[in-house]
Amino acid sequence: MINDILNEADGKMDKSVEATREEFAAIRAGRVNPSMFNKIVVDYYGSPTPLQQLASFTAPEARIILIAPYDQGAMHNILKAIRDSDLGVNPADDGKVIRCVFPELTEERRKEYIKISRHKAEEGRVAVRNLRRTAKQHLERLEKDGEVGQDDLTGAEKRLDGLTKKHTDAIDEMLKHKEAELLEV
Protein backbone atom coordinates (compact mmCIF):
# COMPACT_ATOMS: atom_id res chain seq x y z
CA MET A 1 0.00 0.00 0.00
CA ILE A 2 2.70 2.47 1.01
CA ASN A 3 4.74 1.75 -2.12
CA ASP A 4 1.67 2.25 -4.32
CA ILE A 5 1.03 5.68 -2.79
CA LEU A 6 4.70 6.69 -3.09
CA ASN A 7 4.98 5.41 -6.67
CA GLU A 8 1.84 7.28 -7.67
CA ALA A 9 3.14 10.47 -6.03
CA ASP A 10 6.51 10.03 -7.77
CA GLY A 11 4.84 9.63 -11.17
CA LYS A 12 2.66 12.67 -10.69
CA MET A 13 5.62 14.73 -9.46
CA ASP A 14 7.56 13.67 -12.57
CA LYS A 15 4.67 14.99 -14.67
CA SER A 16 4.74 18.30 -12.78
CA VAL A 17 8.48 18.64 -13.44
CA GLU A 18 7.92 17.82 -17.12
CA ALA A 19 5.11 20.40 -17.35
CA THR A 20 7.46 22.99 -15.86
CA ARG A 21 10.13 22.00 -18.40
CA GLU A 22 7.61 22.57 -21.21
CA GLU A 23 6.69 25.97 -19.74
CA PHE A 24 10.39 26.91 -19.73
CA ALA A 25 10.78 25.76 -23.34
CA ALA A 26 8.07 28.20 -24.38
CA ILE A 27 10.00 31.13 -22.88
CA ARG A 28 12.31 32.59 -25.49
CA ALA A 29 16.00 32.92 -24.71
CA GLY A 30 18.57 33.81 -27.38
CA ARG A 31 17.42 31.51 -30.16
CA VAL A 32 13.78 31.15 -31.17
CA ASN A 33 12.24 27.75 -30.71
CA PRO A 34 9.12 26.25 -32.34
CA SER A 35 7.89 25.21 -28.88
CA MET A 36 7.18 28.91 -28.29
CA PHE A 37 4.10 28.32 -30.45
CA ASN A 38 2.82 25.34 -28.38
CA LYS A 39 0.08 27.28 -26.62
CA ILE A 40 -1.30 28.97 -29.73
CA VAL A 41 -4.73 27.72 -30.75
CA VAL A 42 -6.16 28.54 -34.17
CA ASP A 43 -9.82 28.71 -35.15
CA TYR A 44 -9.72 26.10 -37.93
CA TYR A 45 -13.09 25.79 -39.69
CA GLY A 46 -14.93 26.59 -36.48
CA SER A 47 -13.00 24.36 -34.10
CA PRO A 48 -10.05 25.41 -31.92
CA THR A 49 -6.97 23.52 -33.14
CA PRO A 50 -3.37 23.65 -31.84
CA LEU A 51 -1.07 25.39 -34.32
CA GLN A 52 1.31 22.37 -34.32
CA GLN A 53 -1.40 20.33 -36.03
CA LEU A 54 -1.86 22.88 -38.81
CA ALA A 55 1.69 23.71 -39.89
CA SER A 56 5.36 22.76 -39.92
CA PHE A 57 8.04 24.95 -38.38
CA THR A 58 11.62 25.71 -39.40
CA ALA A 59 14.14 28.07 -37.85
CA PRO A 60 16.59 29.12 -40.59
CA GLU A 61 18.18 31.77 -38.37
CA ALA A 62 18.38 32.49 -34.65
CA ARG A 63 15.58 35.09 -34.71
CA ILE A 64 13.36 33.80 -37.56
CA ILE A 65 10.74 31.06 -37.66
CA LEU A 66 9.06 30.00 -40.87
CA ILE A 67 5.62 28.44 -40.53
CA ALA A 68 4.33 26.44 -43.49
CA PRO A 69 0.59 25.71 -43.15
CA TYR A 70 -0.53 22.32 -44.43
CA ASP A 71 -3.76 23.97 -45.62
CA GLN A 72 -3.31 27.36 -47.30
CA GLY A 73 -6.94 28.15 -46.44
CA ALA A 74 -5.95 28.36 -42.78
CA MET A 75 -3.27 31.02 -43.44
CA HIS A 76 -5.44 33.99 -42.39
CA ASN A 77 -6.56 32.34 -39.13
CA ILE A 78 -3.00 31.28 -38.28
CA LEU A 79 -1.78 34.85 -38.82
CA LYS A 80 -4.56 36.19 -36.59
CA ALA A 81 -3.82 33.67 -33.83
CA ILE A 82 -0.10 34.55 -33.85
CA ARG A 83 -0.85 38.29 -33.76
CA ASP A 84 -3.29 37.79 -30.87
CA SER A 85 -0.77 35.73 -28.87
CA ASP A 86 1.66 37.18 -26.34
CA LEU A 87 4.75 36.41 -28.44
CA GLY A 88 5.26 40.05 -29.36
CA VAL A 89 5.84 39.35 -33.03
CA ASN A 90 4.12 40.58 -36.18
CA PRO A 91 3.95 37.70 -38.69
CA ALA A 92 4.18 38.31 -42.43
CA ASP A 93 3.05 35.90 -45.13
CA ASP A 94 4.18 35.52 -48.72
CA GLY A 95 1.27 33.31 -49.74
CA LYS A 96 2.99 30.00 -48.93
CA VAL A 97 4.77 30.49 -45.62
CA ILE A 98 4.46 32.76 -42.61
CA ARG A 99 7.65 34.49 -41.52
CA CYS A 100 8.00 35.51 -37.88
CA VAL A 101 11.01 37.72 -37.17
CA PHE A 102 11.62 38.12 -33.46
CA PRO A 103 13.30 41.29 -32.19
CA GLU A 104 16.60 41.14 -30.32
CA LEU A 105 16.06 40.57 -26.62
CA THR A 106 16.61 43.78 -24.70
CA GLU A 107 17.91 43.65 -21.15
CA GLU A 108 14.48 44.76 -19.95
CA ARG A 109 12.79 41.91 -21.84
CA ARG A 110 15.35 39.40 -20.51
CA LYS A 111 14.58 40.50 -16.95
CA GLU A 112 10.88 40.16 -17.66
CA TYR A 113 11.44 36.62 -18.97
CA ILE A 114 13.48 35.78 -15.86
CA LYS A 115 10.59 37.00 -13.73
CA ILE A 116 8.18 34.83 -15.76
CA SER A 117 10.56 31.86 -15.42
CA ARG A 118 10.71 32.25 -11.65
CA HIS A 119 6.91 32.39 -11.52
CA LYS A 120 6.61 29.20 -13.63
CA ALA A 121 9.18 27.48 -11.38
CA GLU A 122 7.22 28.45 -8.29
CA GLU A 123 4.02 27.08 -9.86
CA GLY A 124 5.87 23.81 -10.48
CA ARG A 125 7.17 23.65 -6.89
CA VAL A 126 3.67 24.37 -5.54
CA ALA A 127 2.25 21.55 -7.69
CA VAL A 128 4.88 19.15 -6.29
CA ARG A 129 4.15 20.24 -2.71
CA ASN A 130 0.41 19.80 -3.27
CA LEU A 131 1.05 16.26 -4.51
CA ARG A 132 3.16 15.64 -1.39
CA ARG A 133 0.33 16.85 0.84
CA THR A 134 -2.18 14.58 -0.92
CA ALA A 135 0.12 11.56 -0.63
CA LYS A 136 0.78 12.34 3.04
CA GLN A 137 -2.97 12.45 3.70
CA HIS A 138 -3.33 9.01 2.07
CA LEU A 139 -0.50 7.65 4.23
CA GLU A 140 -2.03 9.09 7.40
CA ARG A 141 -5.37 7.56 6.47
CA LEU A 142 -3.67 4.14 6.20
CA GLU A 143 -2.21 4.58 9.68
CA LYS A 144 -5.52 5.81 11.09
CA ASP A 145 -7.32 2.79 9.63
CA GLY A 146 -4.73 0.53 11.28
CA GLU A 147 -3.31 -0.82 8.01
CA VAL A 148 0.23 0.39 8.80
CA GLY A 149 2.08 1.18 12.01
CA GLN A 150 3.55 4.47 13.19
CA ASP A 151 7.11 3.37 12.30
CA ASP A 152 6.07 2.47 8.75
CA LEU A 153 4.28 5.81 8.44
CA THR A 154 7.37 7.72 9.63
CA GLY A 155 9.59 5.85 7.15
CA ALA A 156 7.13 6.45 4.32
CA GLU A 157 6.92 10.16 5.14
CA LYS A 158 10.72 10.41 5.02
CA ARG A 159 10.73 8.72 1.60
CA LEU A 160 7.96 11.09 0.47
CA ASP A 161 9.99 14.08 1.67
CA GLY A 162 12.97 12.72 -0.29
CA LEU A 163 10.83 12.47 -3.44
CA THR A 164 9.55 16.00 -2.92
CA LYS A 165 13.07 17.36 -2.47
CA LYS A 166 14.31 15.50 -5.57
CA HIS A 167 11.56 17.01 -7.73
CA THR A 168 11.78 20.55 -6.35
CA ASP A 169 15.57 20.43 -6.79
CA ALA A 170 15.04 19.39 -10.43
CA ILE A 171 12.79 22.42 -10.95
CA ASP A 172 15.34 24.69 -9.25
CA GLU A 173 18.09 23.32 -11.50
CA MET A 174 15.97 23.95 -14.62
CA LEU A 175 15.33 27.50 -13.40
CA LYS A 176 19.04 28.09 -12.88
CA HIS A 177 19.78 26.92 -16.45
CA LYS A 178 16.96 29.03 -17.88
CA GLU A 179 18.16 32.15 -16.06
CA ALA A 180 21.72 31.56 -17.31
CA GLU A 181 20.37 31.07 -20.83
CA LEU A 182 18.38 34.30 -20.62
CA LEU A 183 21.30 36.34 -19.29
CA GLU A 184 23.60 35.06 -22.02
CA VAL A 185 24.07 37.79 -24.61
UniProtKB/Swiss-Prot annotation:
GO CC field: cytoplasm
Domain of life: Bacteria
Subcellular location per the Swiss-Prot or TrEMBL entry: Cytoplasm
GO terms assigned for molecular function: ribosomal large subunit binding
Pfam families: RRF
GO process terms (BP): translational termination
Keywords: Cytoplasm, Protein biosynthesis
InterPro entries tied to this protein: Ribosome_recyc_fac, Ribosome_recyc_fac_dom, RRF_sf
Annotated function: Responsible for the release of ribosomes from messenger RNA at the termination of protein biosynthesis. May increase the efficiency of translation by recycling ribosomes from one round of translation to another.
Record family assignment: Belongs to the RRF family.
Alphabetical list of NCBIfam families matching this protein: frr (TIGR00496)
Protein name per its UniProtKB record: Ribosome-recycling factor
